Amino acid sequence: MKKSILAFAISAIFLTACKKEEVTPTPTGSGPVSIYFEHLFGSSTFNLGQNYITGNNDTMNFSLFNYFVSNFELVKADGGVYTYPVDSSYFLVKESIDSSRTITLKNVPAGEYVGVRLIIGVDSLRNTMPLTSRTGILDPSTGAAGMYWSWNTGYIFLKSEGTCSSSPSMMGMSKMFQHHVGLYGGLNSPTINNVKKINLTFPGTYKAIVGNALAPEIHTKVDISKMYNNVDFSKYSMVMVHPYSATLANNYATMFEVEHVHND
């Protein structure tokens, strides 16, 4: 009996020692980080051509919804920050193109990340660079076609179009709305600055673990209904270079929230 008890005790000590030695390996190398933008209107999946009811009891139907995201920074678990190379950090998200709602940051250094910072729009420096420095998705004639004001020399940060039940009919078009939000503070004369930097902290204990062949995806909810909280379409159905664009920009800066993180 005593021998059995002794053998059991030795086995328990051995197993405990083994468990203590099981340490999660430190991530090494580098890898991709993907960010998926899930478009919603309140609790409903967002789709072009579908009716949605706002908090003001307006019925909205969208024909277009596009926006730029840029200038990404990843916040490390130890408080450090990795700044993604700026020249590669511009992306155009279009509701009409499913693949555009997933963006990938390449060659991110290994580590554990607990948050992401980004700009909704295009920063003032890039807005004022020579066209030769604005290629790819920022080329006004190709990648950024329809998202650039040639007459105002600046990018449209977010473009939303469609119909709304409380919009007035004008120019032969019934109940139409067009919200084109841009303006970066101005070059030769001051303007409104609608460049919005947002800080998204991962909920709970979620971390994006980069390295060791892992490719995390940050699942981000984008609730478009928040952009239209308390918007009076009878007054502001057409907003472009207008002071009210600041209200729309402040609203859409609240649309984004990280729901969870996959580490695959």
Write out the residue ranges for each language-model feature.
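Positively charged n-region of N-terminal signal peptides that target proteins for export
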Residues: 1-4, 19-20
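Sec-dependent signal peptide hydrophobic core
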Residues: 5-10
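C-terminal motif of bacterial Sec signal peptides marking the signal peptidase cleavage site
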Residues: 14-17
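A short, solvent-exposed, low-complexity linear motif enriched for acidic/polar residues
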Residues: 19-264
